[in-house]
């Protein structure tokens, strides 16, 4: 126990160790050569052991060479003076704490720095793509001794200590060393093991405030509401998805079917008692269902660690850790691996736009605005109560860019859906005049965010061929999906929010009124090929009072289900990749609720079975018929037959591939149409390959069971035409027999 009177005679360095304010404890602790050696002593070993009753220096345990460590009077410093040649490079300290508990460990202050100069330089430049292998907590062997290297970035800290269940959460035991002006702090602690809990105790240089922070680069965390990071061993998981990864590296995604099932893992399905399913349980159940339904990919709402269930994962605190709600990091690897083995891709919802203000996480990490902007006009998103990243800071960009690569490389994720891109690109996003700061040119474009996104896409596509990066971007920002070398942002695809809103608004209208809003169906084709669009019926459309997909539809129950089947027929035949949120595929009545399972019991009822069967058949048809996907992002893959029949609320068009085509006719009224004529490009016999009004889907079964033969009657710029029967609120797909 330290004695204040004795402390008055100590050097400033020793006092700073006692007061836990020293920036480099290696200057004081560990092994040091004496400035004036003698015949019996040329070396000093000094350790600081708060609460120690006694301590000894283990020189050679096998030969029982143990020397006493003498307490510096009135302090918890212990010292040994002797000849350095007697000591091994790494000696052990054996001591008893105030509770008489015996402790033995190697001296952490006898190890050389571990972070290399090149590593620190690349990080300062914002270009260390494997920085997650250095920063954080990493088990490693140094000089043959097992331990854990801890490292973090906190340039405005006066002192940082590693605290955990291995040192009684006492910041005096393991203060870290700062590496010059890099802002990086590190300490190798021998004997600490995977599974141990830890945090960083940080003292701010300006204010002297001391606080605990979880590890920004932590790869595992305690189950909420606890917030400690968990030391995680290097994974020995044996991946079995080599065939999938090889295929992904060479696939032409722009000419391939892409049908995405959007899933929230915590509420897709739960156990009998309402508990979460594990990653491994979800892997099998979800893969079986997705294969049955015919989706090509699963997109999961953010799986990175987050403290609040209500945020759905969008307020991330552990960017490098799969949430512990469903299991361990290797359990999540199993989830990905199993889906890949079943031929299913995985897209991860990723949130680089903002982060929460939780005191244990990134917010004011070292007591200053480190990851965020100091000025709230740049650094705060008031709508969401979150903070905005400072993309102009190299180390912040590196944190995010390396994180994107981390998921693609370490977890074999097939793509990232980047959340809230519009909020990143616009300095005045959701702000009134005077609440934002213009860029250097006086505009509202966030030039630093733009550069960040271009760099994100360049490195993701450059290092992981075939990986997708998809933007949720809700404005008219130009060239979102155009290559970075022509000035675009470089995304693979962009959500088509305009088409989605127009379509849902149109479908929500009573059919008798639809004729007056026909342009909501046709306008989207004016810009359909200006970007690589994805058509999203996402989670955002079935929450907060917007109603479920089935409840958006007008009419009685029969008409609601018919409208929904028609809507999905439109989705699967319109140019662009597809995305459908869970529950919509079987017409769940209620809005999505993250705290419980989907209403799977509805599949006991025919109408819900019918919608599910229609979606399943549309998925499989979409994957089997090249004209429905091969030119999804090309204007020559779509041709209107008739977009002008607003009076009857009917549209018809042709989808084309390199070798065949499909006719699509959609009737948006409950009135059957007989002998409805459409022009066709090729004479011959046509047959119905899909009818959303089929009895198998719960419809009235009106359609064209017999083959249809063209007539030499010119119609709508085509020399041949067909007379077809259109079912009420129904969609037809026809092909040459």
Swiss-Prot record:
Q: What does this protein do?
A: Catalyzes the formation of the alpha-1,6-glucosidic linkages in glycogen by scission of a 1,4-alpha-linked oligosaccharide from growing alpha-1,4-glucan chains and the subsequent attachment of the oligosaccharide to the alpha-1,6 position.
Which SMART domains does the record associate with it?
A: Aamy
Species of the source? Cellvibrio japonicus (strain Ueda107) (Pseudomonas fluorescens subsp. cellulosa)
This protein's assembly is summarised as: Monomer.
Taken from the UniProt entry, a GO cellular component term is: cytosol
EC number(s) reported in the record? 2.4.1.18
Recorded name of the encoding gene: glgB
Q: Does the keyword Heme apply?
A: no
The entry sums up its family as follows: Belongs to the glycosyl hydrolase 13 family. GlgB subfamily.
Q: What Gene Ontology molecular-function terms does this entry list?
A: 1,4-alpha-glucan branching enzyme activity; cation binding; hydrolase activity, hydrolyzing O-glycosyl compounds
Q: What is this protein called?
A: 1,4-alpha-glucan branching enzyme GlgB
